[in-house]
Amino acid sequence: MWKKLSVVGMSSALALSLAACGSESSSKEEGSSSKSDVIEATIKDAAYVISSEDDGQSVDSETGLLEVNVKVTNKTNSSIMLDSYDGVKLYDGDEQIEPENVYDTEVGLDDDSSGTIGGKKVKNVKYYFNVEKDKSYEVGLKPRTKDVEDEAEEVMLKLDTKKYDDSFEALQDPAKAVEAYVKTLYFGEKDKNYDKLVSADKEKIEEQAKEAFVDRMSTATSGTNVDDSEMNKMYDTYKATLAEKAKLEPRVVARGKDKAEVKLKYSSVSLSDVYDSLGDYAKEYMEQNATFDREVAYEYAVTKFDKIMEDTDAKNSSYDMTIDLKLKDGKWEIDSSAVKDFNTAFGEGLL
């Protein structure tokens, strides 16, 4: 009799234990997947991003904006609503954190603020949270069903931000790519980030920059026929002067996974100033030699080009460049409109 009761007792205890485990696993599982009677959810991936809404200031050395991509399956036959206004939360222990509203479609950032999921359908949704590096959180998903009296259970997903440190460290790569691009192609410098981060037709862009300079100098020398070897020397001097005097201050103002927007504050050597200096030397030559031969006068002025570049200071641009980039095969491509701006600023020397 005692043995029989013991078996019954053990069976009852086991049943209660299994029931408890079943209830727990229905709302929370180890890892980044979880389910309830209404939904099944999985964190597919996540990455740190930068939003333009705060002009790129959402990131410091320890915190950042994390884009979390979640795959949600509606297990019911009816549509459900899972939106970031009241159905999605981030938990830091007892602290509840609301998701951020982000709308930067130019770089692929767009939260799913009103997500309807049809019956038996699967939807990939994105949510944005301000988080700390190397910290564990939980994402809570609580959908609304058509039956207002039947409140859905909140599903909890574990989120370990340490897994996404690589994306945090790469947030400023677009700015590094812009700086390496300009220094390599327009200043003639070697930048370690060029081969690592930049995708560009180097020969084509360098040729375009040189052509812009040559056209500008042809005007500045009043049509004087400057031979190719002399023009090449002038261009080399100009690039060396840019490398010495020009300043570049790029910053990422918005960045998604594979798109970015960079603002470039810069200074450059104005070829308008060089134009004026060449004219002054030509005028000086004509006055000293009592001649009106402008071609000969400008041939003399060209011989002073190195000194002119030495004496000419860089000037700050009155506006910041806006540069759009795309990530392709692990490297950043710069939009063609920005290349035109670079040619104007660092080829033609127009500020």
Model-identified regions with their sequence ranges:
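Bacterial signal peptide processing site
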Residues: G22-S25
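Short, surface-exposed ligand- or partner-binding patches at beta-edge/loop junctions that are enriched
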Residues: N130-M156, S337
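Short, solvent-exposed, Trp/other aromatic-anchored flexible loops in extracytoplasmic proteins
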Residues: E100-E138, K304-Y319
